Amino acid sequence: MSKEIPTPYMWSYQPQMGLAAGAAQDYSTRINYMSAGPHMISRVNGIRAHRNRILLEQAAITTTPRNNLNPRSWPAALVYQESPAPTTVVLPRDAQAEVQMTNSGAQLAGGFRHRVRSPGQGITHLTIRGRGIQLNDESVSSSLGLRPDGTFQIGGAGRPSFTPRQAILTLQTSSSEPRSGGIGTLQFIEEFVPSVYFNPFSGPPGHYPDQFIPNFDAVKDSADGYD
């Protein structure tokens, strides 16, 4: 009975390539029942068989069906596209420029701004011109002037997504093309559930997975010393 209940193969992760670096049986998880009686041995075998059933069910749920157990390059459609954490930027505030925007009715799109040098002076003044138009708003406001706090709504309608007192801009980056190749640690845990391999040494040697051989090389995708 105990020989028919295999010890699962635990997969290891190759972080540089994002691949599985092979699997080995973890005999440290086996319960020592050498001095136990038949009743205890039967209970231990029942626990081991139940564990293997759980692993088989988990593999059926989380593992992606594929011909190659450990592909060298995962297609983008099968790779988790992890979004990087957003970046928070503190916006600079220029009280003098905001007052000039309000007084001049600055326009967000169109118009222009230029610097005027006063005759006989070396000081450059910032001049902003516009018509005080708020862009793309479904509701018509009674006042067409810009807000005195310098907060503008460029697109959409309704209330802006930030407050004047919260001068913080959150940026979310994303890649222009989906990533392919190796997989991350989270996907590795789901894809490479501990393997339950029944009767591993009953068939021809060529049918035994290379990944289960101790000297398997993940870089060469082969086991050293084996053809």
From Swiss-Prot:
Propeptide: 112-157
Subunit record text: Interacts with the peripentonal hexons as well as the hexons in the facets. Part of a complex composed of the core-capsid bridging protein, the endosome lysis protein VI and the hexon-linking protein VIII; these interactions bridge the virus core to the capsid.
Cited InterPro entries: Adeno_PVIII
Remaining remarks: All late proteins expressed from the major late promoter are produced by alternative splicing and alternative polyadenylation of the same gene giving rise to non-overlapping ORFs. A leader sequence is present in the N-terminus of all these mRNAs and is recognized by the viral shutoff protein to provide expression although conventional translation via ribosome scanning from the cap has been shut off in the host cell.
Residue numbers carrying Phosphoserine: 118, 174
Gene: L4
Family classification: Belongs to the adenoviridae hexon-linking protein family.
Record keywords: Capsid protein, Host nucleus, Late protein, Phosphoprotein, Virion
Keyword Secreted: no
Domain of life, per lineage: Viruses
Induction: Expressed in the late phase of the viral replicative cycle.
Gene3D superfamilies given in the database record: 6.10.250.1460
UniProt organism field: Human adenovirus C serotype 5 (HAdV-5)
Modified residues (Phosphothreonine): 64
Protein name: Pre-hexon-linking protein VIII
Taxonomic path: Viruses, Varidnaviria, Bamfordvirae, Preplasmiviricota, Tectiliviricetes
Processing and modification events after translation: Cleaved by the viral protease during virion maturation. May cause the middle segment to be shed from the capsid.
GO cellular component: host cell nucleus; viral capsid
Record-marked site positions (Cleavage): 111-112, 157-158
A Gene Ontology molecular function term of the record: hexon binding
